[in-house]
Structures are given as structure tokens and as C-alpha cells.
């Protein structure tokens, strides 16, 4: 695993936010990774393993996740605030543009940022997310998000997560489940727990603020930039129909890749996902020349 530096920046409200910074050349855009709803920088270890050194890789932790400070006002657990935080980081680091790798919520943030600051996006990957989301997946996520569970050992945590999610990743091995568990949980004095502020669930369960047409406008803002759409074959959040519609809407810019035998979300270790990310980065470099 490549080494990284833990760095911090501050939100407009003064929240101390964390990111992992994997060194790489400064003469091309960095890869900026934004994780999903309950996830953290460790989710993108496969990206760093593959590209650090060749690319600068920045893995952010959204407010209330990982080493980033929780928000006293849970209504601020919203993509508008996450995007403002990310823009502050880009400005702090003097980064003109980046290749955005957004998993689930991170992809929503990427689309929202494109709608206001498209010039900051040199290319993008949307990992199992789109402008329309299947209610089945929303209901599944809502059934567990915000419910803090404590395990007495890593073995208990790993076994429980494997039992609950085996239909999402039916071909994962014990080692796969162990890595997954250690990426999304951490040790506390009370035991093994998820590493996020459980109050993020309050904003997640709030009614949608915009009609679906507005979400498609956000997606369309990515036009003219190299785009990779990843979909887990078993995904209950991004339907095959919507993924195809996305690829057709931005034909010429977008590549759709379906990762077999996984649900929401591909973990970016799959050969199909890694080959697709390679192609995306080549297209980004072609545009830079």
C-alpha cells in the first residue's frame, strides 16, 4: 500500500475536515475521490494502490465521517455543503481542476459541482449513482443508516456484515469481507463501530428537494468531459435503464461499464472497474494535450 499524508482543511463554518493525500505529479490534475454516504477515505485504497505515484490522489472525508469533524447542525449534512467544502479544499491547494471519482453520494456531489463549477472537472467517474435513484436501494440504505451498532471483535463485525450483505457481493471471500469491514468501521473504547456521525440519517430521510428533471440537469452539466459510469450488475440503486439513458444522453463523452456479480457499489478492486478507470484517465490525458 502506498504511503499518504493526513491533511486537513476547514469548512466555511470552521469544521476541521480530513483528507488523505497520496503524492504524485503536480503537472496534471489530481484524482479527487469522494466517498459514499457512510464511508470514508479508506474506500479508495484500491484507487491509491493503482495510481498513487503516477497521479496525485486525494481522498476526502465528508463532514461527519472518518477523521472529519461532525456537524453540530445535522441539516448541514447535505450535498450543497459538501460541494462548498470541496471547493474550499481545491482553492486551498491551488488545484484548478481534478478528475473526480465519486461513489454514490460522492457522485451526486460531483454532478452538483459540475452544475456550478464545471471548469473544475477534468473528468469524472460516477460509481453506481445517477440522476434517478431506485427506491428499493433508498429503502435498503434507510433501514440501517443512522443505527449505531457495536461489535465486540473484528470477527463478529465481519461475520455480521457478510451475513447481511452477502446477496450484494455473492462472490466475495472472507478476506474481501475483512477488508470491507475494516474500511467502514473503527475501534472505539466501546467496541467496533461504524465511523460516521449517526445524525447523517436525519438529512438522508428528508423529502427530496428537487424534481427528477432538475437532477438530469445536474448530470448534463458533465457534458464535454470524459465520463465513466460504473454500475454494479446487481445494483438496487442505479437501474440498468437509467444507466443506459445516462450513457446515451452524453454519448461521445460517457462510457458505461457494468461490473458483474456486485451490487451497490463496486469496490473498485474489480478488474472491469480498474480497466475502465485506466481508460478514463487516458481520455483525460488526451484532452490535456
Language-model features, listed with the residues they occupy:
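Alpha/beta-hydrolase fold catalytic core
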Residues: 1-31, 53-54, 95-96, 257, ...
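Conserved serine/cysteine hydrolase catalytic core
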Residues: 187-248
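Conserved HGGG/HGGXW glycine-rich cap/lid loop of the alpha/beta-hydrolase fold
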Residues: 15-70
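Catalytic histidine-centered segment of alpha/beta-hydrolase-like enzymes
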Residues: 262-272
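Catalytic histidine neighborhood in serine/cysteine hydrolases
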Residues: 250-264
Amino acid at each position: 500500500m502506498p504511503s499518504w499524508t493526513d491533511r486537513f482543511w476547514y469548512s466555511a463554518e470552521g469544521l476541521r475536515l480530513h483528507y488523505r493525500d497520496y503524492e504524485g505529479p503536480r503537472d496534471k490534475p489530481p484524482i479527487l475521490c469522494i466517498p459514499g454516504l457512510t464511508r470514508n477515505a479508506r474506500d479508495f485504497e484500491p484507487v491509491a494502490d493503482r495510481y498513487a505515484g503516477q497521479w496525485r490522489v486525494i481522498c476526502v472525508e465528508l463532514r461527519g465521517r472518518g477523521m472529519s469533524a461532525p456537524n453540530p447542525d445535522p441539516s448541514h449534512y447535505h450535498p450543497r455543503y459538501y460541494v462548498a467544502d470541496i471547493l474550499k479544499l481545491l482553492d486551498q491547494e491551488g488545484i484548478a481542476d481534478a478528475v473526480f471519482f465519486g461513489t454514490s453520494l460522492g457522485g451526486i456531489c460531483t454532478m452538483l459541482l459540475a452544475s456550478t463549477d464545471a471548469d473544475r472537472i477534468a473528468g469524472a467517474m460516477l460509481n453506481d449513482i445517477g440522476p434517478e435513484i431506485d427506491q428499493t436501494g433508498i429503502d435498503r440504505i434507510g433501514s440501517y443508516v443512522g443505527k449505531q451498532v457495536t461489535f465486540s471483535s473484528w470477527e463478529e463485525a465481519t461475520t455480521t456484515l457478510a451475513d447481511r450483505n452477502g446477496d450484494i457481493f455473492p462472490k466475495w471471500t472472507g478476506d474481501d469481507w475483512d477488508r470491507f469491514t475494516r474500511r467502514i468501521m473503527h475501534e472505539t473504547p466501546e467496541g467496533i463501530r461504524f465511523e460516521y456521525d449517526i445524525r447523517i440519517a436525519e438529512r438522508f430521510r428528508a423529502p427530496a428537494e428537487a424534481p427528477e428533471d432538475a437532477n438530469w440537469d445536474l448530470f448534463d452539466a458533465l457534458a464535454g468531459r470524459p465520463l465513466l459510469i460504473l454500475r454494479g450488475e446487481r445494483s438496487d440503486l442505479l437501474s440498468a435503464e437509467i444507466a443506459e439513458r445516462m450513457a446515451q444522453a452524453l454519448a461521445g463523452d460517457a462510457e458505461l461499464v457494468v461490473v458483474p456479480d456486485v451490487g451497490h457499489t463496486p469496490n473498485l478492486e474489480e478488474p472491469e472497474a480498474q480497466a475502465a478507470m485506466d481508460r478514463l484517465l487516458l481520455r483525460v490525458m488526451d484532452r490535456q494535450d
